[in-house]
């Protein structure tokens, strides 16, 4: 059974035996590990199991308790690797394991494949009494992380901020760090509860309805509150503007990319193949290059290291600030949105409204997993004939045009092929989507 997916191990009712085996496999090549966990009810169970495997294999283990992923990623610099027990935005019955290198980057597919081979081939009975690792606890991780982040943000304005932590790991950091940064903070869903009683951890418009209503109520008297909302492990964030609008992920990313280039003079930024062409349009004005990479924080971090770009972000709200660290950080990202507002001297709603609006369409077509590659091969060849141009095949199949683009990509976690279209006019968007759906369905039927 394949364990690692697009973001570590993540599954419903994660078996502690799997966690034990992962820990034991890690101990083959690493001798000093740090472990953090989010608020899920199975967190202690999975932490204990993976710790047992590590100790049995002779790896020393330090636990730092309930923390967001950015805290774990920052802490990893003092160890051989970091282990985060989280299922991110998934419902409470899920849990997972995500591994981080010493530099804060998540394990890449080659590293995960190496672990999978060890797990598949090992008997897990090699531990002996004279080669057991040492276990310890560090209660200072949150303090160290918070101090480091606050040293590297510069906010002089006393912003009004509603922080929504989803009863998840962000609770132990975000309300305090925004307060220490000088903000007037109202915290929502800010007590830790692995059942996510306030809202589900995916920070989307549906789940954030109550938080939006709170902000609208506060701002009815001209208070100008904005919202910062996290997912289950706070490696992501989304903002809610003063009008109570959950900001479009693409628009917020485009606005922030422009800010980074204007403030720092950066000549390039990194984003993914599914990000809006508004980024290209914005940065072209400043002569900055947009480097696109595969979807996922691993690919973004790798490209940041390779190119020396200062910032990389995905339209999912996963942003990496290389000048601070290489772990996706929704807490730092929220603070830097405030820096952006201060830099421009504008409300967030006005900054967002300046970003070009395009027509976006998304569809998903059911496709058996064993046909996905054949379907993508068909789309690549057929699309070349239809559009009379070479496709981009970095991640899925993408066709770019002057007026828009289309990305067709197989889901890494579900039996679907997804079609994403963005265009400057509605007719062109609909035409692209029709072609995309037709190619996917034909590719399935002919294979």
Curated annotation (Swiss-Prot):
Phosphoserine modified-residue sites: 88
Signal peptide residues on this chain, from the entry's feature table: none
Keyword S-adenosyl-L-methionine: no
GO molecular function: magnesium ion binding; phosphoglucosamine mutase activity
Residue positions of the active site: 88 (phosphoserine intermediate)
List of residues binding Mg(2+): 88, 231, 233, 235
SUPFAM superfamilies, per database record: Phosphoglucomutase, C-terminal domain (SSF55957), Phosphoglucomutase, first 3 domains (SSF53738)
Modifications the protein undergoes after translation, according to the UniProt entry: Activated by phosphorylation.
Keywords: Isomerase, Magnesium, Metal-binding, Phosphoprotein
Gene3D superfamilies linked: Alpha-D-Glucose-1,6-Bisphosphate, subunit A, domain 3 (3.40.120.10), Alpha-D-phosphohexomutase, C-terminal domain (3.30.310.50)
Biological processes per GO annotation: carbohydrate metabolic process
Enzyme type, top EC level: isomerase
InterPro entries listed in its UniProt record: A-D-PHexomutase_a/b/a-I (IPR005844), A-D-PHexomutase_a/b/a-I/II/III (IPR016055), A-D-PHexomutase_a/b/a-II (IPR005845), A-D-PHexomutase_a/b/a-III (IPR005846), A-D-PHexomutase_C (IPR005843), A-D-PHexomutase_C_sf (IPR036900), A-D-PHexomutase_CS (IPR016066), Alpha-D-phosphohexomutase_SF (IPR005841)
Annotated EC: 5.4.2.10
Task performed by this protein: Catalyzes the conversion of glucosamine-6-phosphate to glucosamine-1-phosphate.
Protein family (similarity comment): Belongs to the phosphohexose mutase family.
Protein name: Phosphoglucosamine mutase
Organism: Methanococcus maripaludis (strain C7 / ATCC BAA-1331)
């Amino acid at each position: 059974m394949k364990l690692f997916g697009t973001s570590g191990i993540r599954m419903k009712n994660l078996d502690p035996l799997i966690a034990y085996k992962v820990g034991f496999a890690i101990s083959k090549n690493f001798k000093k590990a740090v472990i953090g966990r989010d608020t899920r009810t199975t967190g202690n169970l999975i932490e204990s199991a993976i710790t047992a495997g590590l100790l049995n294999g002779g790896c020393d283990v330090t636990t730092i308790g309930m923390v967001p992923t950015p805290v774990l990623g920052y802490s990893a610099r003092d160890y051989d690797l970091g282990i985060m027990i989280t299922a991110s935005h998934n419902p409470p019955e899920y849990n997972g394991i995500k591994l981080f290198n010493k530099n804060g980057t998540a394990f890449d597919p080659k590293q995960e494949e190496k672990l999978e081979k060890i797990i598949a081939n090992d008997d897990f009975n090699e531990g002996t009494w004279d080669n057991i690792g040492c276990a310890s606890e560090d209660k200072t991780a949150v303090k160290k992380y918070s101090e480091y982040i606050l040293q590297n943000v510069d906010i002089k304005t006393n912003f009004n901020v509603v922080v929504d932590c989803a009863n998840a790991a962000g609770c132990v950091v975000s309300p305090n760090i925004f307060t220490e940064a000088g903000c007037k903070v109202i915290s929502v869903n800010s007590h830790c509860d692995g059942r996510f009683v306030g809202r589900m951890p995916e920070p989307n418009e549906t789940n954030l309805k109550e938080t939006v209503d709170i902000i609208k109520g506060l701002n009815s008297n001209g208070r100008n509150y904005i919202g910062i909302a996290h997912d289950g492990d706070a490696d992501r964030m989304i903002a809610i503007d003063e009008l109570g609008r959950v900001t479009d992920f693409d628009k917020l990313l485009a606005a922030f990319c422009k800010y980074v280039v204007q403030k720092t003079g950066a000549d390039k930024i990194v984003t993914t193949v599914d990000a809006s062409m508004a980024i290209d349009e914005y940065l072209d004005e400043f002569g900055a290059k947009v480097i696109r990479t595969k979807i996922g924080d691993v690919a973004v971090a790798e490209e940041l290291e390779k190119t020396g770009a200062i910032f990389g972000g995905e339209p999912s709200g996963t942003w990496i600030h290389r000048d601070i660290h290489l772990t996706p950080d929704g807490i730092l990202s929220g603070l830097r949105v405030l820096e952006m507002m201060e830099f421009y001297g504008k409300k967030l709603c006005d900054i967002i409204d300046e970003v070009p609006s395009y027509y976006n369409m998304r569809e998903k077509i059911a496709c058996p997993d064993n046909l996905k590659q054949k379907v993508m091969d068909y789309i690549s060849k057929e699309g070349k004939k239809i559009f009379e141009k070479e496709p981009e095949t970095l991640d899925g199949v993408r066709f770019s045009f002057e007026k828009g683009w289309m990305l067709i990509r197989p889901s890494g976690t579900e039996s679907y092929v997804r079609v994403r279209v963005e265009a400057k006019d509605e007719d062109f968007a609909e035409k692209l989507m029709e072609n995309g759906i037709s190619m996917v369905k034909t590719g399935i039927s002919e294979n």
